């Protein structure tokens, strides 16, 4: 009798667990979005765009399953403003970062930060229900002000340089 009761309890628990798990899963038809931005990468420097000498098998593999663009222009000729333009969708003359130059204040080097009120891709994706991450070279912050870091601009995860 005890064994029958235990088996019955286990079966009921498994059915309940299955029901709860199946209810929590969503059929999400939105695409996954991975945007790679590389400083100083030319159009023909990837195998997926015709490069024959330099081998880029991992990026080429991603490209086979993805949308590829042929007309993607940097908003600035230097890296920090180009990232600021990409992340905000604004013209380079309308973002707070105009160059890579840092300035000296109280003998401490500080980077010019992206304005905390700038609406970024991270915030846009969050509002659309996506989880987002920024991984790599941010350089749009001041090291001692957390409100200028990537996670403060809508990204759920940030591993920034």
Could you say what each language-model-derived stretch is?
Residues 2-9, 23-161:
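Formylglycine-dependent sulfatase
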Residues 15-24:
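Hydrophobic h-region of N-terminal signal peptides that target proteins for export
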